[in-house]
Amino acid sequence: MEATKVHVVIGVDPENRMYLLDLWRGQTSSDVWIEAWCDLVCKWKPAFWAEEYGQIISGVGPYLKRRAIERRAYTCREQFPSRGDKAVRAQSMRGRMATLGLYVRQGAPWFADLRAELLSFPAGKHDDQVDALGLVGQLLNKIRAGENPKPPTVVRSDGYVPSSEDTRNWSWKTL
């Protein structure tokens, strides 16, 4: 029986609020979850990806790397050892969620299962989604708040621009 694999994608807005943008979960063979991982990386383009060291490197690491290159699924993958108990490993994310929250789209098809697992942890039957969020917690020191989008540049139809916006570095000789 294959182990359940979970991928989560987190985003952070300019106010440092964390959003669970996407989640994939499946009890599948390695090739299936690797394709799901590539799909998420291509869709969301995350800056970092946390994964368990032993499980990935010793098992499917070369295949994952090859598929990522073939699919152009580029991100900075960071491996963390899976030591200690799961409740301890989830503490950094638990603290982050307690202070600044974790925003989740309630209409998401995976929301009910995620909520049930979070509320029953550590006594619940399943903890794979908690593990995935705990891995995100390992990256908290690298996560920065997002930036507000810059307003679009307005181009005047007559071709004139204010001198403060002119980027040609005029000198007194060209006036």
Question: Model-predicted segments: where are they?
Answer:
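RNase H-like, metal-dependent nuclease domains and their acidic two-metal-ion catalytic environment used
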Residues: 1-79, 104-175
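Short glycine-centered helix-capping/turn motifs at secondary-structure transition points
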Residues: 100-101
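Conserved beta-strand -> loop -> alpha-helix junction used to position metal-binding or nucleic-acid-contacting
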Residues: 70-96
